[in-house]
């Protein structure tokens, strides 16, 4: 089983897809990694040689911020926005959409479930 960046890649999947299990690596970045390291994207993870796994591991380690470091960086960026009190920071603090979406009717995912307001119904 190939273990890269602390993640066990699924054995039966193609390497191209298996790399996307690592936080911070999507399908395009996965293709770029495989192209640069010279590994065939159609190879199954279980069929990778130890040398290929090490090549991929080294390339990712040198060129990308992934997993815990990326999560920490994102959390610190959000914390900084909240602390300086900018518009985006205020939106994060209030749990509202940050990127300019309308909130009158939508944004349920970000705002959470509806809360009932007592005394509103007409009798």
UniProtKB/Swiss-Prot annotation:
Entry GO MF terms: rRNA binding; structural constituent of ribosome; tRNA binding
Write down the Pfam families for this protein, in alphabetical order. Answer: Ribosomal_S13
| GO CC aspect terms | cytosol; small ribosomal subunit
Please give the superkingdom of this protein's source: Bacteria
Q: Which UniProt keywords apply?
A: Ribonucleoprotein, Ribosomal protein, RNA-binding, rRNA-binding, tRNA-binding
Q: Where is this region: Disordered?
A: 95-123
Q: Entry's InterPro entries? A: Rbsml_uS13_C, Ribosomal_uS13, Ribosomal_uS13-like_H2TH, Ribosomal_uS13_bac-type, Ribosomal_uS13_CS
Q: Which SUPFAM superfamilies match?
A: S13-like H2TH domain (SSF46946)
Biological process (GO), any one: translation
**Keyword Ribosomal protein: yes or no?**
yes
- What exactly does this protein do? Located at the top of the head of the 30S subunit, it contacts several helices of the 16S rRNA. In the 70S ribosome it contacts the 23S rRNA (bridge B1a) and protein L5 of the 50S subunit (bridge B1b), connecting the 2 subunits; these bridges are implicated in subunit movement. Contacts the tRNAs in the A and P-sites.
Description of how the protein assembles with itself and partners: Part of the 30S ribosomal subunit. Forms a loose heterodimer with protein S19. Forms two bridges to the 50S subunit in the 70S ribosome.
Question: What protein family is recorded?
Answer: Belongs to the universal ribosomal protein uS13 family.
Query: What name does UniProt use for this protein?
Result: Small ribosomal subunit protein uS13
Source organism (scientific name): Clostridium novyi (strain NT)
């Amino acid at each position: 089983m190939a273990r890269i960046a602390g993640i066990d890649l699924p054995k039966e999947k193609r390497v191209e897809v298996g790399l996307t299990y690592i936080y911070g690596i999507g399908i395009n970045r996965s293709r770029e990694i495989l192209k640069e390291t010279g590994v065939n994207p159609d190879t199954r993870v279980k069929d990778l040689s130890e040398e290929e796994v090490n090549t991929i591991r080294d390339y990712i380690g040198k060129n990308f911020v992934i997993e815990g470091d990326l999560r920490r960086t994102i959390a610190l960026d959000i914390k900084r926005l909240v602390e300086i009190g900018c518009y985006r920071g205020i939106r994060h603090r209030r749990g509202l959409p940050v990127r300019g979406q309308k909130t009158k009717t939508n944004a349920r995912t970000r705002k959470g479930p509806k809360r009932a307001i007592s005394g509103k119904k007409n009798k």
